[in-house]
From Swiss-Prot:
Belongs to the NSE2 family. A zinc finger (SP-RING-type) spans 154-240. It is found in: Nucleus; Chromosome, Telomere; Nucleus, PML body. E3 SUMO-protein ligase component of the SMC5-SMC6 complex, a complex involved in DNA double-strand break repair by homologous recombination. Is not be required for the stability of the complex. The complex may promote sister chromatid homologous recombination by recruiting the SMC1-SMC3 cohesin complex to double-strand breaks. Acts as an E3 ligase mediating SUMO attachment to various proteins such as SMC6L1 and TSNAX, the shelterin complex subunits TERF1, TERF2, TINF2 and TERF2IP, RAD51AP1, and maybe the cohesin components RAD21 and STAG2. There is a cross-link at K90, K107, K125, K130 (Glycyl lysine isopeptide (Lys-Gly) (interchain with G-Cter in SUMO2)). Keywords: Acetylation, Cell cycle, Cell division, Chromosome, DNA damage, DNA recombination, DNA repair, Isopeptide bond, Metal-binding, Mitosis, Nucleus, Phosphoprotein, Telomere, Transferase, Ubl conjugation, Ubl conjugation pathway, Zinc, Zinc-finger. It holds the Pfam family zf-Nse. This is E3 SUMO-protein ligase NSE2. One of its GO terms (cellular component) is Smc5-Smc6 complex. Sumoylated, possibly via autosumoylation. One of its GO terms (biological process) is cellular senescence. Its EC number is 2.3.2.-.
Amino acid sequence: MPGRSSTNSGSTRYISFSGVESALSSLKTFQSCISSGMDTVSSVALDLVETQTEVSSEYSMDKAMVEFAKMDRELNHYVKAVQSTINHVKEERPEKVPDLKLLVEKKFLALQDKNSDADFKENEKFVQFKQQLRELKKQYGIHADRENDGIEGMDEDMIVTQSQTNFICPITQLEMKKPVKNKMCGHTYEEEAIVRMIESKHKRKKKACCPKIGCSHTDMRMSDLIPDEALRRAIESHNKKKKRHSE
């Protein structure tokens, strides 16, 4: 990734990193754009499953998500390389200002050389995308060995009856409208109910336990919760079909 820096000589006590830090701020803004792009790809992918729409491999949402994950990794590496270089120069205080651009590029390439597919397992949005896509396909009866055959083998009656108990919030005992999943244990709850429960516990300086009977997760935090888009769509699909049958 290209970068620019001044190579003027002089004592580090006169070096101003304000320009570099401003550029870093801009890069972090771009990170939010990548995050939004991943959200869009995830939403489109779930739409395709829900509407039973086939697309060519050229427009695969999986491929698009991988590209976004690669961009996110590359940008994170570059930001890390710049921050590491700045910290190093501040600590070492060399008599002459080194070639900052060269130092950043060396650190960046060193990080890039360690790239592997396993990195994607650390990308929360990528992992969430794969999990939600898998869950929605499961709700629609699409198995992994049938993914390339579009919606072949889909059984709509199975969609209606499958895992309806998963639609019930363990706190309210009502069907969920805005389900969120606990990243730590995998259980789901109605967002408003679980947020209220966690806040209530924390205000009393107590730990919030997962309300699902038998769950061993005893220290829930707000950061553990993520929207369960796949389950929300499955619930809506079930309710639409139930409404059609009653008309």
